[in-house]
């Protein structure tokens, strides 16, 4: 698929908000709640460096994703939204693997979708003080607060602001160079959004999906029992 226009990407995110998760067009979303609502099974595990996650949609429309818990929480939220693009707007059912810095058209499309889904333009602008928005001189305090409102990483917010022409490249480079955990702590914020986490978490009903695959003959009885035995040791969020 070729690279989508900005207008098409925005149309996809609006369609997703209205028709899939039944929410308004501008409010922040809780990405974990979205996964539960959609019935997408998500597992958070330690994966190789440079690997953000993977996803697959079965021929029977079951959807699954694996997210790298070594990345910071904000990055994980972005990866989930990125994989939702592949699961709902992608064209094949083979496993999709997401790596940092992917430049293929569909990877760029998925990144644009994730950015617009997590940080809708109107909702984002509403978070910015009027004078800062009009001048393009966004303060560190505003950045930190907005990152927490939308549950996104520092880099993700800066890129979104730059692409919306709210900040210029000089401002982008200025704020990109900071150590965000130190800045967050200096302003009195919890820094967990900027650190790894969620290892061992799963969202959804892993047991039900495993049984469906067992009943279809897709996994062996031994594998099915192994999954069931694993569940009490995992941290579930459903």
What are these regions (language model features)?
Residues 1-238:
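Active-site hotspot residues in diverse enzymes, especially metal/ion-binding acidic/histidine motifs
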